[in-house]
Amino acid sequence: MEEEMTSILHPLDVSDTLDALVINAIDGTGNRDAIIEELSRQPMARMMMEVREINGVPTQFTGVSVYKLRVANCIRRLHLILAGTETDEEISSDIYYTQCIANPAFKGFIFMILTAMEDVVKTIGIPPPLLKYRFVSYHPAEPLDFALCLLISYLENRNVSSSDPSLYVQLQSFLKYAWSTVTPMRKMRRFLCITNTWLLNTLMELSSISPFDSNHVLPHYIIYKHLSSTNGVCDVLISLYECNNLGEAFQVPVSTRGKCSIVINKGLLNGAFQQKWLSDIICDWWHYGRNNLRGEECLFHTYQK
């Protein structure tokens, strides 16, 4: 009996979780390069939103500027239908990038850095007071990086009724192209590609479509999917992945109220971002944060050209 117990592997020993990778790195087991590669794929850009500021109007953070998209035949850019347009006229992501850069109201994107294990479906595995250290303001310098940011926000805001296998095939081709342009000089692009890889595969899994890479489906989401579809599961287990009110205790200065407008859909991948206290933290961070993380240089050591 004792031999049988000792032969049973611990779940961390056969998983790709962050804990398992750290254990392998410390023990010296496994291929070190492969471990480092997988560790570098754990952080993601989440709650990606465009930012616009106009005097006299609340700062707008939106994840739904793109109503619909498809991949161009050349697979090097996206064709977008922007939200609020009266017709379904398409615009290429390159042209939209040029328009945004020329618009003084456009302030780039903001996002939150989460690891795969901190993304807990309908809640966040980080204490609310620490979240302000996880937000980043980013202004893409190239059209492809801009398109990758748009794609992140688009995937985050999709729901199960908008599942489209043919679109996922297109997006996989677009991501393959984006990955082919990643170099040591383009660490931010790699980071954005990693995020899109996680989100695309997870969205496919939640939509009951076989993902392109099952090793990069966010772990909490697949567990939650199985728990939700299983009869007789303890409510306590389900509650681990549901929204909590921890953030209500985080006191945001009253002066920030009404200074921001956050617009996101109730998508399959952004259930954790619907809470009012999180919006207050973002607004306070944007208007009153000191030493805010801004740009690629705050995340990576970059090479000087």
Curated annotation (Swiss-Prot):
The keyword Phosphoprotein does not apply. Keywords: Host cytoplasm, Host Golgi apparatus, Virion, Virion tegument. InterPro entries: Herpes_UL7 (IPR002600). GO terms for cellular component: host cell Golgi apparatus; viral tegument. Signal peptide: none annotated. It is found in: Virion; Virion tegument; Host cytoplasm; Host Golgi apparatus. Belongs to the herpesviridae cytoplasmic envelopment protein 1 family. Plays a critical role in cytoplasmic virus egress. Participates in the final step of tegumentation and envelope acquisition within the host cytoplasm. This is Cytoplasmic envelopment protein 1. It comes from Gallid herpesvirus 2 (strain Chicken/Md5/ATCC VR-987) (GaHV-2). The lineage of its organism: Viruses, Duplodnaviria, Heunggongvirae, Peploviricota, Herviviricetes. The gene is MDV019.
